[in-house]
Amino acid sequence: MQIKDLKKSYNNIPALKGVNINISVGEFFGLLGPNGAGKTTTINILTGLVFKDHGNCLVFDKDIVKDYRYTRSKIGIAAQELSVDWFFTIEKLLYFQAGYYGISTEKAKRKVNELLDRLGLDKKRDSRLRQLSGGMKRRFQIAKALVHDPEILILDEPTAGVDVELRHDLWKYLKELHHEGKTILLTTHYIEEAELLCENVAIIDEGIILKKGSPKKLTKELGNSGLTVQIGQNVNDVDISPFLNDLNYTIEDSRLHFSVKDPEKAIPEIIQRLAKINIPLQSIKTETSSLEDVFLDLTGKSINE
């Protein structure tokens, strides 16, 4: 999937300002951003719900506008909002969804049974949608997205508002889908979710992609690590500033707190400097930045804002 210089405005207010994203076949990709950042607009353009103003979107090298029948057949979307007839059973709704893509009755039956079983909905197959809990509705959305067996699965906030147990169940299932070769695009409010599931992420804010890369790469390049060095005496009793004046550190009783980019390189250097002035070292504790720390530094906002 390729998104090139994608732009979109609503009432002359820019929602996307030249978004560029490449997602490889079989990749698990996360799109992170605060509310109103442009995540859902991007997804809606990919699935034909919103028309772009400028740019190109390709799915398996096919244009989403010129070759919309092909590209939409390759994508399944689990949207935030349900748009179905609430009076039918969930089994019937899944059969309808399969029919929209020309899936044969026999093949649809096998797929519907498989999805109901794997998503824990088998006992609810004869229930109407309005009778399901919020978590069950989320599962149904994923089943609906997968019933025509698309090669790309798009998930828009799939675990928002669900309990912890269900969230972990969905994470397990998404990992299985990824292992089976499914390409997955995820938007989420949960940084932990992106760190756990995604191979690569893009951080978007106010319609602009700020950074892209693996969670590990982003935290290493943009985050700061902390080192807490416990020594055997009160730091204030010793003048250590001449030996550490080029380092970013603070003092608290018998502890030194350092802010460093690379702990592996910093630790030997700090030990060596303290040894030169005979400072007894008792312990070293490391703390690394999280993807959430990087997100806050880049956007200046909470993920939920």
Residue map of PLM features:
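Conserved ABC ATPase signature
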Residues: 128-132
